[in-house]
Amino acid sequence: MKKPLIYVVDDNKITVKLMRRYLEVNGFEVGEAYDGVECLELVDKQKPDAIVLDVMMPRLDGYDTAKRLKSEASTKEIPVVIVTALNDVPNQIKAIDSGADDFLSKPIEEKLLVAKVRLLSNLSFSRKREKKLREVVASLQNGDKTYQWKPVDEILQEEGLI
């Protein structure tokens, strides 16, 4: 099975490097962006399993980036973790209202970051598997013989889902 792909988005290169290290040593593949616009461009090229997104960035902040991701059918299922030093309740609520799936306060605690990213990437993976299985069932119900004699495990393996 391939490593989960996580995008780390922060305008602070040191923070990106730190989170990259935390995630890579724990078995994740990491892509980087330094603002919301770059993040959206990356997502257009390849959908990640989760995004760790800073709030305060130039061009497009984390809240607006999350809103855009969650408003598009092709990206709304990508889990987003908002990360910020603004860790008061109003900002946590703003993160949730923007569509974020979780919230982390700076300074980043490695074990908590890894645990939340692992949880959300597993959720993303499960959603992809469920979607593929629903497609297979619908295909079989419609008389399509593409999957007729293939075991489910083989179908999921072909899709990189096991």
Predicted features and spans:
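Receiver (REC) domain active-site loop signature in two-component systems and cognate sites
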Residues: M57, L69, V80
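Two-component/phosphorelay signaling modules centered on CheY-like receiver
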Residues: K13-G31
